[in-house]
Structures are given as structure tokens and as C-alpha cells.
């Protein structure tokens, strides 16, 4: 089995208690079978403490308090389980987050999800073109090679710096046999606002596109940040294009383009409202998009259906 990951992957470090959007708050964390067995066998008072924090079910999950905080999260925003027993005691999701995986025949690709603010900051701060690295054990089967070659054509277009961002996106769509319904950013914002929000403030963020937006002014200043949108476009292609083993390729390519275009539009809306939009604000927009769209199976399904 070959495992590949973006070159920046190894630079990721969790910011733990310093994180403003703690992944132990607001998320119902499922517990894998092996971890559940391990927690059930923990001895002593701490074992009782852990078991009291687990809600039985299929699968079981950690309880959330009235503020949406995991029952194992301390007041200093560090995990009591990890601090007491070490990282090896964490369940799979807690140990793995914000990593995602794309599984192909003979190949697994690993990346960092943008719902994590540190992963988003790391991605948007990169100016180098994205390359994949890892351990290649043997050549993948032909069907995987064909999918990878197809995706590489789209990645090459996404990173063709002779073209504007818009030119790259317009090139990707026909290469993928895809098209976007002709709608304004305001109309697309209304569509995404009709889906279930996962975080407070998301609907209000989308609503900014219902007001007049100075795209011309944003285009002039955002030229200096074009690599940020290139990184986003590449990220969405890597994460989603082959996520279903090559099914729904046109819709998934269109989703990558639409996601990048919407983040550009949301940046323009933020600048119109405030007169400026900082790097930190652009990171937060990427995180919000990821948390409210990518990390909801229902919302992803609705978006892909809309693009099919």
C-alpha cells in the first residue's frame, strides 16, 4: 500500500489549548471499538471518570455538557484523558483529527482538513506549489493510475501561474467535463444558507453576499494573495475529486471550483463591510466553509446533487 501526503503535512502541529476553535467543543466525538474496550477496562477512580464521560450507543461517543464541551475537556482546554494517560489513550478520531484520508486501490492519500484553524493557517501561508510525497511500496493498479493522471491535469491547471485564478478555474471545468450552474455569488450563498449550519455565525457570514460587494476593489488588492486561492483550489481537488473512488468526477471538480470561488466572494464581502480583510480573517473564512460544508455529510451530498 502506498501512502502519500502534501509536502506541508509534516509541518502541522496541534496548538492544543491555544486553539480558538477547539475541536473538543461542539462536536460529538464517536469512539471506535478498540478504544471503547480499553476505556471499559480502565481501573480505579479515573476509569470510572472516563466511563461516566461516555454515552453508550452504536457507536458510543463522549458526552457534551450544556456548553457543548466534551466531558473530558479541562477548563484549560486540554484533554484530561491525554494529560493523564498519554496520546496513545485517545480514540481514533481524537488522535487523527484534523487528518482526512482518500482511499484508492493500492493507494491512500492523507491530508489536513481546513475545519482546523491551524491547518487552514498552514495551508494559506504556503507559497510553494503543492507536491505529494510519501512511501511508494509498489505501482498502483491501472484504474488508480488513470484517475491520478486525470487529477494531475486538473492540478496542473490549478497551479498554472501564467493564468489568473479565474482563468485556471475556467480551464479546470471543461477538462473535468464539468460545468457550474450560472448563478451569482449571492444566489449560491442563499443555497448554502438553506442547508443546516454547524456553527453559529455561518448563516450571517453568507448573508453578507446579499448586500452590495465591491469585487473590483477586492480584485485589485487580492492579487497579492492569489497563491492563497491557488492553495485552496488544490486542496479541494485533492480532498474531494477522488474521494468516492472516481465516481461523480465532474460534480466533485465543480465543487472544488465553486468552493474556491465562494471563499473569494466571501473575502470580497468582508472587505466591503470592514474596509479590509486580514490574513487571519481569510483563514477563518476557509475554516468556516470547511466546518459547515465539508464536515457535514448531508451538506456535501446536497452540494454535489446541486452540481450534478
Show which residues each predicted segment covers.
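Polybasic, low-complexity association/targeting segments
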Residues: 8-59
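Local cysteine-cluster metal-coordination motifs and their immediate loop/turn environment
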Residues: 11-29, 65-100, 113-120
Amino acid at each position: 500500500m502506498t501512502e502519500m501526503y502534501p509536502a506541508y503535512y509534516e509541518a502541522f502541529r496541534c496548538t492544543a489549548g491555544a486553539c480558538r476553535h477547539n475541536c473538543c467543543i461542539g462536536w460529538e466525538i464517536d469512539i471506535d471499538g478498540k478504544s471503547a474496550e480499553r476505556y471499559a477496562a480502565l481501573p480505579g477512580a479515573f476509569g470510572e471518570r472516563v466511563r461516566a464521560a461516555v454515552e453508550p450507543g452504536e457507536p458510543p461517543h463522549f458526552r457534551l455538557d450544556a456548553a457543548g464541551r466534551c466531558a473530558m475537556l479541562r477548563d484549560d482546554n486540554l484533554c484530561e484523558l491525554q494529560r493523564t494517560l498519554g496520546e496513545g489513550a485517545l480514540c481514533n478520531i481524537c488522535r487523527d483529527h484534523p487528518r482526512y484520508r482518500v482511499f484508492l486501490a493500492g493507494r491512500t492519500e492523507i491530508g489536513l482538513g481546513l475545519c482546523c484553524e491551524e491547518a487552514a493557517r498552514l495551508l494559506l501561508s504556503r507559497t510553494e506549489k503543492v507536491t505529494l510525497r510519501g512511501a511508494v511500496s509498489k505501482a498502483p493498479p491501472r484504474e488508480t493510475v488513470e484517475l491520478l493522471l486525470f487529477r494531475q491535469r486538473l492540478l496542473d491547471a490549478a497551479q498554472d501561474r501564467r493564468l489568473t485564478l479565474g482563468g485556471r478555474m475556467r480551464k479546470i471545468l471543461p477538462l473535468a467535463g464539468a460545468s457550474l450552474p450560472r448563478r451569482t455569488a449571492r444566489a449560491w450563498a442563499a443555497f448554502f444558507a438553506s442547508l443546516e449550519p454547524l456553527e453559529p455565525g455561518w448563516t450571517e457570514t453568507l448573508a453578507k453576499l446579499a448586500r452590495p460587494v465591491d469585487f473590483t476593489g477586492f480584485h485589485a488588492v487580492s492579487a497579492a494573495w492569489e497563491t492563497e486561492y491557488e492553495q485552496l483550489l488544490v486542496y479541494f481537488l485533492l480532498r474531494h475529486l477522488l474521494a468516492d473512488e472516481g465516481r461523480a468526477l465532474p460534480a466533485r471538480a465543480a465543487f472544488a471550483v465553486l468552493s474556491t470561488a465562494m471563499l473569494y466572494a466571501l473575502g470580497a464581502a468582508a472587505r466591503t463591510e470592514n474596509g479590509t480583510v486580514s490574513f487571519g480573517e481569510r483563514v477563518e473564512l476557509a475554516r468556516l466553509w470547511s466546518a459547515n460544508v465539508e464536515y457535514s455529510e448531508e451538506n456535501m451530498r446536497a452540494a454535489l446533487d446541486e452540481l450534478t
